[in-house]
Amino acid sequence: MRILFCTDGSEISMNALHNASEFIKDAVVDPLCVIDWGFLPSSVNMESESYSKTYENIADSVLNFAEKMVAEKGLILGDKIKSFGSAVEGILEQMEKVEYDLVLLGSHGKKGLQKWLGSVSRQVISNSQIPVFISKKRTKAKKILFTVDGSDQSYNAAKHATGLLDLNEKEIFIISVKENPELLPMEATLDQNWLDSIEKQQRIHATKAINQAKAHIEKVGLTVNNEIILTGNPAQKIIDFVEKEKVDMVIMGARTKTDLSKLLLGSVSKRVLENVTADVLVVSK
């Protein structure tokens, strides 16, 4: 397995490697540090002044620290890469050069607004065709939540994650959320028999989605500790569940916008990514 570890030297970015190391074995890790000097005044000439060397030294220090941490986690150091310019462009360009299996990112986000998905993380996820592991804080890496909705994307996420990560001895949950039919327009909720029928079909669909994912997870030798069907707003129910159960990692699927070669994160995925403090693995395959 080959991993691209994107780091700016911050504690949050290092948390991504720390947390991911609990799920990956014998992986080759390429640390990447992108020095974004776009914030400097246009009057500053990086080539003719001492700034360039200073920032190169910063990048080298960040990469040397990452190298040390890779060794501490028992992983294999690949290439140390430094780049200058837009962080997003630097990451995406490197992803095109090498066939990676996983991208690691720490997300600073907007903590004051309780939104954890930073602009760099968001753009990388939207443009990535490989799984992206987003980390916000150091976790215990014990409780894993698979979110399923019956779509090919959520099932494929479960399949790919179990092949990519070592989930042995982890506490595994599977959750599916059915929306409350009583929240439909008033004229549609007047017929109780119709509402009961809709609720029954939703439960059948959710049960099928959970059983499909569970069958695969157990097939690869893992144990599902709990499977839950909830009713309500899917994003909020997942967020609440993650907080209540102190989940360490959420596994979610995303689908490709084939016309633009980008991933389409639905409103549920987007809200979960922005509001949980657990790690999130977004799988696009």
Predicted feature descriptions by range:
Residues 1-49, 143-196, 215-222:
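Small/aliphatic-rich secondary-structure junction motif
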Residues 6, 81, 106, 147, ...:
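Active-site-adjacent beta-strand anchor residues
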Residues 13, 59, 117-121, 154, ...:
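Short, conserved glycine- and acidic-residue-centered signature motifs
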Residues 33, 81-82, 176, 228-229, ...:
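Residue-level recognition of beta-strand->loop/alpha-helix junctions
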Residues 49-61, 193-208:
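A short acidic, glycine-rich active-site loop
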Residues 49-54, 68-103, 215-250:
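Structural beta-alpha unit
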Residues 92-140, 240-285:
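Gly/Ser-rich helix-loop-strand patches that form or flank binding pockets
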